[in-house]
Regions:
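Catalytic Tyr-x(3-8)-Lys segment
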Residues: 116, 209-229
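Catalytic Tyr-X3-Lys loop
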Residues: 93, 104-124, 147-148, 165, ...
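C-terminal substrate-recognition "lid" of short-chain dehydrogenase/reductases
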Residues: 226-250, 255
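Short, small/polar-rich loop/turn modules that mediate ligand/substrate recognition or access, typified
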Residues: 184, 189, 243-246
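Conserved mid-core segment of classical short-chain dehydrogenase/reductases
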Residues: 71, 94-112, 131, 135-141, ...
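Canonical Rossmann dinucleotide-binding motif of NAD(H)/NADP(H)-dependent dehydrogenases/reductases
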Residues: 2-33
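Residue(s) in the substrate-gating loop at a strand-loop-helix junction
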Residues: 152
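Alpha-helical segment proximal to the catalytic Tyr-Lys
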Residues: 131, 180-182
């Protein structure tokens, strides 16, 4: 797929990795629909993006775990841009909680929330977006769509307090190949990015000393990843037609003990 011909949906696109990805696509000529929950920054984000990329962007209030919410938003995208041929799933939550602690056992509802948003929400977006992609006329290479999910190095090297998060991201990574096989008959590719330590809003709030300590754990380059690097890999995955069913670690070779 050529980026300038893409109508992409980016979940979690109002901040962090998702926002960087949305901007990367917009700057390269794509039409982008950002699906995210409304927050205090949404109004200013909409104004800024419309100022920079008038007519090329939609920002929709969407809960990825709610099928009705997703279906309604997909209809808006189709009416505005006429097609959906790329989905990048960045929506997610990261909640750290040990299995047992001074307060007792890990709350089950908290575990279920992480699984619901990160894993079930990802699959919900995939299944409903794929139905729309199947309606597309194949391009010259026969392709109808491209889906990129977001896992994490925690899928492979989970740390203390990450039982729920690692399970959710491990599920995303494990589903990559079967999803690619399921959708191959529809000429839709599926890949996953597993980012390491990235300078997202979650880490930006840490003291500089803490960020430096985290960066030292990276093999090379010894720094936190930039969201633009995630965005560029997503862009590459869209254009690389032979890349399918793969989970790519984007982590500076970090392997956490």
């Amino acid at each position: 797929l050529k980026i300038k011909e893409v109508s992409a949906i980016v979940t979690g696109g109002a901040s962090g990795l998702g926002l960087a990805t949305a901007r990367e696509f917009l700057e390269r000529g794509a039409s982008v629909s950002i699906f995210d929950l409304e927050n205090s920054n949404t109004a200013s984000l909409v104004a800024k993006l419309n100022e920079d990329f008038e007519g090329k962007v939609i920002v929709a209030n969407v809960d990825v775990t709610d099928s009705n919410s997703v279906t309604k938003a997909l209809g808006v995208v189709n009416r505005r841009f006429g097609k959906i041929n790329v989905l990048v799933n960045c929506a997610g939550v990261a909640i750290a909680k040990k299995t047992t602690g001074k307060e007792g056992a890990h709350p089950l509802d908290l575990y279920q929330k992480v699984i619901d948003v990160n894993l079930v929400g990802t699959f919900n977006m995939v299944r409903l977006s794929a139905i729309e992609m199947e309606k597309n006329k194949p391009n010259d290479s026969g392709e109808r769509g491209c889906i990129i999910n977001t896992a994490s190095v925690a899928a492979f090297d989970g740390q203390k307090g990450q039982a729920a998060y690692s399970a959710s991201k491990g599920g995303v990574a494990a589903s990559t190949l079967p999803l690619a096989r399921d959708l191959a008959s529809s000429n839709i590719r599926v890949n996953t990015i597993a980012p390491g330590l990235f300078l997202t809003p979650m880490l930006e709030g840490l003291p500089e000393e803490a960020k430096e300590d985290l960066a030292k754990q990276v093999v090379f380059p010894k720094r936190l990843g930039s969201p633009t690097e995630f965005a560029k890999l997503a862009s590459f995955m869209i254009q690389s037609e032979y890349l399918n069913g793969e989970t790519v670690r984007l982590d500076g070779a970090i392997r956490l003990p």
